[in-house]
Amino acid sequence: MKSARYILAFIAFIALYYFLPMNTRLLWQPDETRYAEISREMLASGDWIVPHMLGLRYFEKPIAGYWFNSIGQWLFGNSNFAVRAGVIFATLITALLVAWFAMRLWRDKRLAVLSAVIYLSLIIVYGIGTYAVLDPFIAFWLMAGMCSFWLAMQAQTWKGKSAGFLLLGLTCGMGVMTKGFLALAVPVLSVLPWVVAQKRWKDLFMYGGLAIVSCVLIILPWGLAIAAREPDFWHYFFWVEHIQRFAQDDAQHKAPFWYYIPIILLGSLPWLGLLPGALRSGWQNRGHHAAAFYLLCWIVMPLLFFSMAKGKLLTYILSCFAPLAILMAGYGIQSAQKNIIALRFNGWINIAFGITGIIATFVVSPWGPIKSPVWAHFESYKVFCSWAIFSLWAFFGWYTLTDSEKRWPYAALCPLGLALLVGFAMPDRVRESKQPQFFVGMTSEMLKPSRYILTDSVGVAAGLAWSLQRDDIMLYQQRGELKYGLDYPDVKDKFIPAASFTSWLNQHRQEGIITLVLSVDRDEDINRLAIPPADAVDHQGRLVLIQYLPK
């Protein structure tokens, strides 16, 4: 009976965090709108080999992540939950692997369940795991690779070792097909310190070739298919998306070496108090507990690798938090039995975070001291939603202090208010600039009959395309991340330079309504834009709709 209650509580936990709130949050540009539209076009065209966005070739990532996202939209239709269904599934399956691996290592059901709960409630895991990007998929394949390598090295027969390495190759191959060759670098770097410490070179060299073979066999069918269809894909994907993005001086998203330190700290909420002890236990047990050191290697080595790369994004280190959750669960149980100082420290951190959020909400509210508040006066209810988010965080932090020895796991409920209310608390000024669905909802009657729609933002273009279910949105003035796709001669008409817009407008105006959607500064005078006089203008915050009727 008690176990049934725990199962029901866990199901409710997943439903409240990962299912119920998804349709209350609009899609973000550029990431969510991009992946939503690529997968929608894949379903609409039936082309499961070459990814396209806005009808243009899109070679920034391989295909597997789009497959899973497309299946989500195929199953659940045209909804925000459908767009996020793939990453939610990947996150939940990763949590299942976390629990299974913890059980395999320590044979402790409580530790296994707590590992999964901690993983799912980590703020960085929850944030990325409900956000339609490809990183939750690669995190799953890396976790599966972590499990596969361990199984292979612990197997006592040649059949078991062979199966483990073949499975490792499969996970690496799917990782490559999801996000690229980083899915090969991260596992190799992660296992090397453990192999050296355990002196397991013999097994690695004897069976490692099987992983290479299975990895190649997984990649080969699609790799050959896209090479036949688009011969320059692999050159662009390897050179631009890997070498330039991560290593060269002009890498995208350049950041200093220490960039990930604050992300690790904030991402560990609401379990930050367990972080130092969890890492320390993994290091202290390296000599007599191979599993703890193995987990530590899968945290530290990817973190060092991504820290040394010139290009950095917070999503890159998502895979580090799966092994960290297991170490945190083990350290939490140990602390409850021996010394609850770390558990109480964790409770106070959550109280402090909640109180800080409450104060910060007031400061940026319409009643606060700043001149440009985040929320306008008519958005007062959103301020109260924000206060509720941080009040719940502080409340559950306090609740864990009332009996830290038994109630410390309730820290998993600290982000509950965030999960349920963040969509309602979002300021209109953010929606107007970062969530194109808000703009489409306000201007749909003008957008739908348009023969041509042009915009100067790729993220907005993808949002318009997905919301309106059309892939013929054109780019105006700026090409952004679609520059490479627009260089193909068969799609030159998809981009209109600002200098050519007047002549293009005169040529196409008789074909139907032409709508221009532009990003502008909040205080910019749209009457001074260097475009022909319009028949209709609708200004929505940072976006302005400019419409030309046939003449």
From Swiss-Prot:
Catalyzes the transfer of the L-Ara4N moiety of the glycolipid undecaprenyl phosphate-alpha-L-Ara4N to lipid A. The modified arabinose is attached to lipid A and is required for resistance to polymyxin and cationic antimicrobial peptides. Its EC number is 2.4.2.43. Belongs to the glycosyltransferase 83 family. One of its GO terms (molecular function) is 4-amino-4-deoxy-L-arabinose transferase activity. One of its GO terms (biological process) is lipid A biosynthetic process. Pfam families: PMT. Pathway: Lipopolysaccharide metabolism; 4-amino-4-deoxy-beta-L-arabinose-lipid A biosynthesis. InterPro entries: ArnT_tfrase, Glyco_trans_39/83, LipidA_mod_glycosyltrf_83. It catalyses: 4-amino-4-deoxy-alpha-L-arabinopyranosyl di-trans,octa-cis-undecaprenyl phosphate + lipid IVA = lipid IIA + di-trans,octa-cis-undecaprenyl phosphate. This is Undecaprenyl phosphate-alpha-4-amino-4-deoxy-L-arabinose arabinosyl transferase. Its main location: membrane. The chain crosses the membrane at residues 7-27, 81-101, 111-133, 137-154, 176-196, 208-228, 255-275, 289-309, 313-333, 347-367, 383-403, 408-428. It is a multi-pass membrane protein. HAMAP family: ArnT_transfer. GO terms for cellular component: plasma membrane. It comes from Escherichia fergusonii (strain ATCC 35469 / DSM 13698 / CCUG 18766 / IAM 14443 / JCM 21226 / LMG 7866 / NBRC 102419 / NCTC 12128 / CDC 0568-73). It comes from the Bacteria. The keyword Membrane applies. Keywords: Cell inner membrane, Cell membrane, Glycosyltransferase, Lipid A biosynthesis, Lipid biosynthesis, Lipid metabolism, Lipopolysaccharide biosynthesis, Membrane, Transferase, Transmembrane, Transmembrane helix. The keyword Membrane applies. It is found in: Cell inner membrane. It is an enzyme of class 2 (transferase).
